[in-house]
Curated annotation (Swiss-Prot):
One of its GO terms (molecular function) is sodium channel regulator activity. It holds the Pfam family Toxin_4. Binds specifically to voltage-gated sodium channels (Nav), thereby delaying their inactivation during signal transduction. Gene3D superfamilies: Anthopleurin-A (2.20.20.10). This is Delta-actitoxin-Aer1a. It comes from Anemonia erythraea.
């Protein structure tokens, strides 16, 4: 999957882990949409 910035990682990408992943059919349980993504399927696992 492709990385993306999680909403809970902070306001910028510098120094933050891009621990998101692309899920084609929506986010699995415990995963949520990535910050700043309009497209569905970009998910990140929240702490």
């Amino acid at each position: 999957g492709a990385p993306c910035l999680c909403a809970n990682s902070g306001p910028n990408t510098r120094g933050n882990d891009l621990n998101g992943i692309v899920w084609v059919f929506g986010c699995p349980s415990g995963w949520h949409d990535c910050h700043g993504r309009a497209m569905v399927g970009y998910c990140c696992q929240e702490d």
